[in-house]
């Protein structure tokens, strides 16, 4: 009886937290096997589901455990039911059915797939901002056209969408070498269509794309505003693949509902499967990315240097990669192996505008000017009191410290009484958002800036 209550409570919590599609996939498909000695054994039909349960649902297991058992329950995940002795044979048969779509068609040479071999799931750094998208991509790699079709992933530039598309394709080809896979940016798809149309070779074009097992289209927003004939051809290609249960994965810089200039019937089809977003990596994920990008370069990137870099670039991965390239160039010229904060700062200054303003404005000067403007002392700013005027002054000072200096997030936090770097990020995002909405605050901050400079 308690086990049933416990599991029902978990499902209730999960339903409140997850979207409908994520709840159906991650929660409904899971099964509680037993609770014994404060350990809940939970069956998950797919191994990639464990990451989501660990990152997003583990805490609700703890809460439900205290509610029902008055004890802390620890989850243990299994991927084969104890009584299931034929799962491997079933899986093998399923895979044969899934992937052996076109036995009479010749497989596509890897060089013609458009895939980049370097992009795999193994070297994709996972974090809170991409966990759902990664899980969905892994699910697609395991069950083509059965899990999510289409899978639509959107997010800003440099967040890993292209990496994930290639990882899906490479994973499929690793397991099923004869699968017909094609990765192509939407702009290239459009140009390919127009070339075949001009040459009168549309049958060849249709055969190329409609015989695929997996179509990976990058930056589908490029299709917006294109002529009716172009959108019509993509619509027909989409339908032909979907009707034959072939997998389609799309990426975009915005969600389907925000794709302007596209026929409504296309937008509707983009939402048939699952839509997932990727958001900028958090501080810890940026450090992990930096570690991954620098470990084989032959240089010693000190830990405080990585933290400094992670604090400087918080919008996308490409900025981090660009900074690493600049740093290694300086290191080669100077013939040094140890990468210190000073070397990193030298490289970053060359990448940022208003160089003259960088590293010359002390944080305490910012605190002083902000404090004078709002009638708040530096001591109050560094403290933890939550009075409205103090909170505003503190957040404005953190925002300006981020905008006007070259200091890392941890360094800024330290200058505000040892605040965590996440507090600085929150302050920066909050004030930046308020500036867009509140002209008075924008003018106040501009006035403070003039006094600081």
Curated annotation (Swiss-Prot):
A Pfam family hit: Bac_DnaA
PANTHER family named in the record: CHROMOSOMAL REPLICATION INITIATOR PROTEIN DNAA (PTHR30050:SF2)
InterPro entries assigned to the protein according to its UniProt record, in alphabetical order: AAA+_ATPase, Chromosome_initiator_DnaA, Chromosome_initiator_DnaA-like, Chromosome_initiator_DnaA_CS, DnaA_C, DnaA_dom, P-loop_NTPase, Trp_repressor/repl_initiator
Protein family (similarity comment): Belongs to the DnaA family.
Region: Domain I, interacts with DnaA modulators, residue numbers: 1-74
Full protein name: Chromosomal replication initiator protein DnaA
Main location group: cytoplasm
Subunit note: Oligomerizes as a right-handed, spiral filament on DNA at oriC.
SMART domains: AAA, Bac_DnaA_C
Residue segments, region Domain III, AAA+ region: 114-331
Residues annotated for ATP binding in this entry: 158, 160-162
Keywords of the record: ATP-binding, Cytoplasm, DNA replication, DNA-binding, Lipid-binding, Nucleotide-binding
Comment block on domains: Domain I is involved in oligomerization and binding regulators, domain II is flexibile and of varying length in different bacteria, domain III forms the AAA+ region, while domain IV binds dsDNA.
Source taxon at top rank: Bacteria
GO function term, MF aspect, one: lipid binding
Biological role stated in the UniProt entry: Plays an essential role in the initiation and regulation of chromosomal replication. ATP-DnaA binds to the origin of replication (oriC) to initiate formation of the DNA replication initiation complex once per cell cycle. Binds the DnaA box (a 9 base pair repeat at the origin) and separates the double-stranded (ds)DNA. Forms a right-handed helical filament on oriC DNA; dsDNA binds to the exterior of the filament while single-stranded (ss)DNA is stabiized in the filament's interior.
Region (Domain II): 74-113
NCBIfam families for this protein: DnaA
Region of interest (Domain IV, binds dsDNA), residue spans: 332-453
Cellular component, GO, one term: cytoplasm
Subcellular location: Cytoplasm
GO aspect biological process, one term: regulation of DNA replication
